[in-house]
Amino acid sequence: MKTVIYPGSFDPPTNGHLDIIQRAARVFDKVIVAVLNNPEKNPMFTVAERRKMLEMITKEYANVEIDDFNGLLVDYVREKQVSIVIKGLRAISDFENEMQMALTNRKLAPDIETIFMMTNHKCSFLSSSVVKEVVAFDGCIEGLVPEQIQDYIIEKRNSQRK
C-alpha cells in the first residue's frame, strides 16, 4: 500500500490545496494531510480549526486522513513509516523554494522522496495568504476556497474583529 504525506500550513485550505488532495487520493492508496504547527508563524486559524476545515472538505475521500505535526517534516514522515512526501507547485517560484526544502529533507533523510504535483492552472495564483488578504478587506472568497468552509472562514474573520 502506497501512502503519501501532503504537509502544509493550510491557513486556510484553498481550492489549490483541495486540487492536490483530490488528485493525490486518486494516485495513492492513502493520503495523510499533515497540518504543520509552526510556532514562528502567527496563523489566522488554530491547528484544530485547520484540521476541522480539512476534514470538512475531504470527508468524501475514504483514503484521506487529516493529522498535524510539530518539528521536522522528516521526523514526522519516519514516525508515520511513510517514504513519500507530495508537494503542490503553482509556479516556478514555488519550485525554487520547494526544491530547496526537498534537498534539505533528502540530506536529513535520504530514504524519503519528494514528489511535486502541479496545481490546476485555475489555482496557479491562489495561496492562503491571498485568501486571508481578500477576506480581511471583506472581499468575496467564492471560488478561492472550497464551498464547505467559506462561511467558517468569514465567521472567523468576524469574530476576530470583535
Swiss-Prot record:
<dbReference type="Pfam" id="PF01467">
    <property type="entry name" value="CTP_transf_like"/>
</dbReference>
<feature type="binding site">
    <location>
        <position position="73"/>
    </location>
    <ligand>
        <name>substrate</name>
    </ligand>
</feature>
<feature type="binding site">
    <location>
        <begin position="88"/>
        <end position="90"/>
    </location>
    <ligand>
        <name>ATP</name>
    </ligand>
</feature>
<comment type="pathway">
    <text>Cofactor biosynthesis; coenzyme A biosynthesis; CoA from (R)-pantothenate: step 4/5.</text>
</comment>
<keyword id="KW-0808">Transferase</keyword>
<keyword id="KW-0173">Coenzyme A biosynthesis</keyword>
<dbReference type="GO" id="GO:0004595">
    <property type="term" value="F:pantetheine-phosphate adenylyltransferase activity"/>
</dbReference>
<feature type="binding site">
    <location>
        <position position="98"/>
    </location>
    <ligand>
        <name>ATP</name>
    </ligand>
</feature>
<feature type="binding site">
    <location>
        <position position="17"/>
    </location>
    <ligand>
        <name>ATP</name>
    </ligand>
</feature>
<keyword id="KW-0460">Magnesium</keyword>
<keyword id="KW-0067">ATP-binding</keyword>
<keyword id="KW-0963">Cytoplasm</keyword>
<dbReference type="GO" id="GO:0005524">
    <property type="term" value="F:ATP binding"/>
</dbReference>
<comment type="function">
    <text>Reversibly transfers an adenylyl group from ATP to 4'-phosphopantetheine, yielding dephospho-CoA (dPCoA) and pyrophosphate.</text>
</comment>
<feature type="site" description="Transition state stabilizer">
    <location>
        <position position="17"/>
    </location>
</feature>
<dbReference type="InterPro" id="IPR014729">
    <property type="entry name" value="Rossmann-like_a/b/a_fold"/>
</dbReference>
<dbReference type="InterPro" id="IPR001980">
    <property type="entry name" value="PPAT"/>
</dbReference>
<feature type="binding site">
    <location>
        <position position="41"/>
    </location>
    <ligand>
        <name>substrate</name>
    </ligand>
</feature>
<feature type="binding site">
    <location>
        <begin position="123"/>
        <end position="129"/>
    </location>
    <ligand>
        <name>ATP</name>
    </ligand>
</feature>
<feature type="binding site">
    <location>
        <begin position="9"/>
        <end position="10"/>
    </location>
    <ligand>
        <name>ATP</name>
    </ligand>
</feature>
<keyword id="KW-0547">Nucleotide-binding</keyword>
<dbReference type="GO" id="GO:0015937">
    <property type="term" value="P:coenzyme A biosynthetic process"/>
</dbReference>
<keyword id="KW-0548">Nucleotidyltransferase</keyword>
<dbReference type="InterPro" id="IPR004821">
    <property type="entry name" value="Cyt_trans-like"/>
</dbReference>
<feature type="binding site">
    <location>
        <position position="9"/>
    </location>
    <ligand>
        <name>substrate</name>
    </ligand>
</feature>
<comment type="subunit">
    <text>Homohexamer.</text>
</comment>
<comment type="similarity">
    <text>Belongs to the bacterial CoaD family.</text>
</comment>
<protein>
    <recommendedName>
        <fullName>Phosphopantetheine adenylyltransferase</fullName>
        <ecNumber>2.7.7.3</ecNumber>
    </recommendedName>
</protein>
<feature type="binding site">
    <location>
        <position position="87"/>
    </location>
    <ligand>
        <name>substrate</name>
    </ligand>
</feature>
<dbReference type="GO" id="GO:0005737">
    <property type="term" value="C:cytoplasm"/>
</dbReference>
